[in-house]
């Protein structure tokens, strides 16, 4: 591994880059790069990553986080695209999470519900599948 890191003024990681060379055909490994952004309160708001491997293998992801004025996580969305990694072709996958919290006194930081929507497509969007689950907490 040949990782290089960059940091902001409060030591949050801004990027990680693996400068390894792309391996020969049929070999594992490859180059990776990740970037991170933070808001004025140093909370993670987004991340991106890329991977390049042998035999035209590529992958990338994006992550987005949302917060409310009480600093609670309200949303998380991650999207992944990969080509020729698990099979010859393209895979798109991701999820959207929405968090809600209690409203009664003493329960404003208690997680009340997580709604998640998961999806994936292989080759064409017509093969996508949406799953919607509501997880409730007492």
Regions found by a protein language model. Name each.
Residues 1-138:
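Acidic/glycine-rich beta-solenoid
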């Amino acid at each position: 591994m040949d990782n290089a890191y960059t940091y902001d003024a409060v030591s949050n990681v801004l990027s990680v880059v693996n400068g390894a060379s792309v391996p020969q055909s049929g070999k594992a490994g490859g180059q990776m790069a990740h970037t991170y952004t933070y808001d004025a309160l140093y909370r993670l708001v987004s991340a991106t990553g890329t991977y390049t491997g042998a035999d035209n293998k590529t992958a990338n992801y994006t992550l987005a986080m949302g917060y409310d004025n009480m600093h609670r996580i309200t949303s998380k969305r991650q999207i992944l695209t990969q080509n020729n990694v698990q099979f010859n072709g393209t895979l798109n996958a991701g999820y959207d999470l929405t968090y809600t919290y209690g409203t009664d006194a003493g329960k404003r930081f208690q997680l009340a519900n997580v709604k998640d929507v998961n999806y994936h497509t292989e080759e064409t969007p017509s093969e996508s599948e949406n799953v919607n689950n509501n997880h409730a907490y007492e």
